Amino acid sequence: MKNPLLRPWLTEKSTGLTEQKGQYVFQVKKDADKSDIKKAVEEKFNVDVVSIRTINCLGKTKRQYTRKGLIAGKKSDWKKAIVTLGEGQAIDYYAQPADKSDKQD
């Protein structure tokens, strides 16, 4: 797999996990497995990964009422990974240069 990491998932809850437990949350490709995610994080950020938990998130259903009636749709399903790093290690999301080659998918 080329690069399973899509983007860091920055929310209030994920920021709390980072500050309290040293866990970082990423949105990853749906077909990525834990070994691919571990390799990508270790290579990109030069850290040791202790554990990874993955979550398959279902896309929300959306409805819109129009003159022609109800239009129903669904957002895409996605996957996120919670990565725990070794003791004393950290990732600085903003210091990493943006890789333009990763955005081809």
Curated annotation (Swiss-Prot):
GO MF term set: rRNA binding; structural constituent of ribosome
Keyword Chaperone: no
A GO cellular component entry from the record: ribonucleoprotein complex
Matches recorded under InterPro entries: Nucleotide-bd_a/b_plait_sf, Ribosomal_uL23-like, Ribosomal_uL23/eL15/eS24_sf
GO process terms (BP): translation
Subunit composition and interactions: Part of the 50S ribosomal subunit. Contacts protein L29, and trigger factor when it is bound to the ribosome.
Protein family according to the UniProt entry: Belongs to the universal ribosomal protein uL23 family.
Name this protein carries in UniProt: Large ribosomal subunit protein uL23
UniProt organism field: Chlorobaculum parvum (strain DSM 263 / NCIMB 8327) (Chlorobium vibrioforme subsp. thiosulfatophilum)
Gene: rplW
